[in-house]
């Protein structure tokens, strides 16, 4: 690749991307345009602007994309009840395609030769950023400094920062922070003591949730309203997608909901350990499953359950803009036509449990399932023929096996 003259950098204002900004200027002698997305990470973003200006960025983009993030990425994913490897709610994975989309758009707007990101050569994010970028612009050039430079450790990064007078953030204990990714859906923490999966994570790692043991001693009940699979209200109050997730984070975090300590299988082949906090997403997933339980037909629900692991894997691996994800999304969205109603959750010391659900689109018939008189709603003698028909092949198999044994 010929040396670029202008690069659009996904910039957080943190240590890694600040070093990358300086490295791009030094290595390529190019202009650097920074893009910082407000995904609801809870940080003041003006310091990122000031830092980029101080370091000589030629242009600075800081954009509030919270509503787009939740409406066009998080909510479609939650319609699928997507969970990777049984635990991970894909908080980091789902943010990457939106960031890549804006990187490509800004590159085209500014006439940049390339885009750059701060993902390491060991992780999934390099794959996610680049697959999304190439899906949107097959001719885009991507610079991944972690795969090029010799700054192969945190120690070398810090040395580079000190030599180039780049400020180094400290955590509240005065130490270099964990590797943290945050957005409106979740916060993840990796590295340092967490790299040993046998060691219990210290409580100071958690940023968004209280320790469940310290959560309120009184349960809280909330009601989440849905229309066609998407949350539209909390306790009867209509809200925008980002506002709903923000409010659910606040409520769930207060009760210690959504903490995960997990080891996941990365797309690049290795396993990694992380501490994930997804308070609002945990409540949203529980409630969405609750409303689906009374509005989705059994066949549709079971098919969704079969498709979900593949859908989740596509998002995890970076294939959001792939045709197969789009095809699955169309099927999932079609299933949500009648997923409308309200779910009541009980929140208590780290647990979020569905305790009520109702809908004008409900398939639940109390008349059919009652243990009392059903006024002829269901003829129990019909079950005999149903059982005999379903047993026929099993009887034939058993008869053959007995015959062969004798």
Curated annotation (Swiss-Prot):
Pathway: Amino-acid biosynthesis; L-arginine biosynthesis; L-arginine from L-ornithine and carbamoyl phosphate: step 2/3
Protein name (Swiss-Prot/TrEMBL): Argininosuccinate synthase
Catalytic activity: L-citrulline + L-aspartate + ATP = 2-(N(omega)-L-arginino)succinate + AMP + diphosphate + H(+)
Binding site for L-citrulline: 88, 93, 124, 128, 179, 188, 264, 276
A cellular-component GO term for this protein: cytoplasm
Lineage per the UniProt record: Bacteria, Pseudomonadati, Pseudomonadota, Alphaproteobacteria, Rhodobacterales
Pfam annotation, one family: Arginosuc_synth
Disulfide cysteine pairs (residue numbers): none
InterPro entries listed in its UniProt record: Arginosuc_syn_C (IPR048268), Arginosuc_syn_N (IPR048267), Arginosuc_synth (IPR001518), Arginosuc_synth_CS (IPR018223), Arginosuc_synth_type_1_subfam (IPR023434), AS_cat/multimer_dom_body (IPR024074), Rossmann-like_a/b/a_fold (IPR014729)
A single GO BP: argininosuccinate metabolic process
Family: Belongs to the argininosuccinate synthase family. Type 1 subfamily.
């Amino acid at each position: 690749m010929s040396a670029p003259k202008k690069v659009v950098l996904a910039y957080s204002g943190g240590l890694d991307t600040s070093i990358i900004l300086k490295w791009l200027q030094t290595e390529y002698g190019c202009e650097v345009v920074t893009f910082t997305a407000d995904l609801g990470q809870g940080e003041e973003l003006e310091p990122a602007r000031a830092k980029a200006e101080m370091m000589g960025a030629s242009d600075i983009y800081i954009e509030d994309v919270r509503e787009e993030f939740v409406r066009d990425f998080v909510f479609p994913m939650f319609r699928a009840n997507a969970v990777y490897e049984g635990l991970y709610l894909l908080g980091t994975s789902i943010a990457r395609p939106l960031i890549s989309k804006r990187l490509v758009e800004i590159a085209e707007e500014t006439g940049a030769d390339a885009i750059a990101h701060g993902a390491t050569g060991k992780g999934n994010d390099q794959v996610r950023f680049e697959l999304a970028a190439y899906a949107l612009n097959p001719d885009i050039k991507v610079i991944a400094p972690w795969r090029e430079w010799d700054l192969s450790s945190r120690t070398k990064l810090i040395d580079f920062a000190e030599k180039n007078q780049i400020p180094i953030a400290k955590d509240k204990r005065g130490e270099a922070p964990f590797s943290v990714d945050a957005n409106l859906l979740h916060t993840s923490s990796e590295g340092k003591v967490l790299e040993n999966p046998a060691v219990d994570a210290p409580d100071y790692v958690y940023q968004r949730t209280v320790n469940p043991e310290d959560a309120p001693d009184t349960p809280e009940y909330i009601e989440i309203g849905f229309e066609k699979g998407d949350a539209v209200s909390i306790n009867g109050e209509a809200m925008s997608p980002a506002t709903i997730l923000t409010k659910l984070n606040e409520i769930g975090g207060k009760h210690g909901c959504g903490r995960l300590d997990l080891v996941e299988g990365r797309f690049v082949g290795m396993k990694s350990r992380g501490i994930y906090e997804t308070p609002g997403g945990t409540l949203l997933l529980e409630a969405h499953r609750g409303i689906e339980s009374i509005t989705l037909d059994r066949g549709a629900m079971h098919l969704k359950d079969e498709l979900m692991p593949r859908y989740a894997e596509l998002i995890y691996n970076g294939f959001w803009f792939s045709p197969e994800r789009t095809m699955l999304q169309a099927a999932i969205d079609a299933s949500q036509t009648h997923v409308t109603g309200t779910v009541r959750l009980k929140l208590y010391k780290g647990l979020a449990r569905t305790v009520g659900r109702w809908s004008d689109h409900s398939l639940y018939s109390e008349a059919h399932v009652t243990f009392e008189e059903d006024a002829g709603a269901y003829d129990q003698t019909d079950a005999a023929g149903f059982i005999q028909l379903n047993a026929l092949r099993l009887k034939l198999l058993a008869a053959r096996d007995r015959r062969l044994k004798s």
